[in-house]
Amino acid sequence: MSSYENHQALDGLTLGKSTDYRDNYDVSLLQGVPRSLNRDPLGLTADNLPFHGADIWTLYELSWLNSQGLPQVAVGHVELDYTSVNLIESKSFKLYLNSFNQTRFDTWETVRQTLERDLRACAQGNVSVRLHRLDELEGQPVAHFHGACIDDQDISIDNYQFTTDYLQHAVSGEKQVEETLVSHLLKSNCLITHQPDWGSIQIQYRGRKIDREKLLRYLVSFRHHNEFHEQCVERIFNDILRFCQPETLSIYARYTRRGGLDINPWRSNTDFVPATGRLARQ
């Protein structure tokens, strides 16, 4: 359970409540969640963040009417900057996108600009939006995370409660290594509804070698943990940086789709360019 799970800032969210679906444009449906909710307990403030990054969203269920009333469909790519005051709550994002369904827009660019303007206002930060026609995406191969997968270990696990204990004394030797580790066993739960969130995670670092068994046990300990995707990624970054003290660190997670949206946050303190291809479970 997160320390801020019952925070008053979450009281007004539609998440976890019965809601009506609207099919005419309504920007009021968008809701933000302050990033400070999870950053404050981690000792992170806007002027001392140890990372840069973004939350990458893929919008698979985006449709509207053109000026003649003919339905249009697109796949959207949204990048929400890590410096924004708020993250975007995903159910409200879905409801907001549904409100485009019976709304007429003159051009695709008008749709893109509308999305960008509204998301920036809700997040109180920088947002970029791209729209793709379906034929631009057809035939794209399923991507994979580059790196060594740490999942196939012959170990017994019986603790699924979140703890950073596994990261204590998780590095060994004085030699500096540079490696990329991958796990597909990341599972946490929605902060509000406690529905499961499934993800794959890529951890790229340079520093003293991290024990792979301890790292995997740490990741598995998220299994009963309740936080949003973005918050989990920042927690993982902060914990590894604190306990393992790598010189450079990049964390990138790609989560499975829900409600026509997938969320793929990344955080890094070095040069890092996230690959945006969908993984096998996306």
UniProtKB/Swiss-Prot annotation:
It catalyses: 7-aminomethyl-7-carbaguanine + 2 NADP(+) = 7-cyano-7-deazaguanine + 2 NADPH + 3 H(+). NADPH binds at residues 90-91, 258-259. GO terms for cellular component: cytoplasm. InterPro entries: GTP-CH-I_C/QueF, NADPH_dep_7-cyano-7-deazaG_red, QueF, QueF_N, QueF_type2. Pathway: tRNA modification; tRNA-queuosine biosynthesis. It comes from the Bacteria. The active site is at 190 (thioimide intermediate), 197 (proton donor). Its EC number is 1.7.1.13. Substrate binds at residues 88-90, 229-230. GO terms for molecular function: preQ1 synthase activity. Homodimer. Catalyzes the NADPH-dependent reduction of 7-cyano-7-deazaguanine (preQ0) to 7-aminomethyl-7-deazaguanine (preQ1). PANTHER family: NADPH-DEPENDENT 7-CYANO-7-DEAZAGUANINE REDUCTASE. This is NADPH-dependent 7-cyano-7-deazaguanine reductase. It comes from Salmonella paratyphi A (strain AKU_12601). The lineage of its organism: Bacteria, Pseudomonadati, Pseudomonadota, Gammaproteobacteria, Enterobacterales.
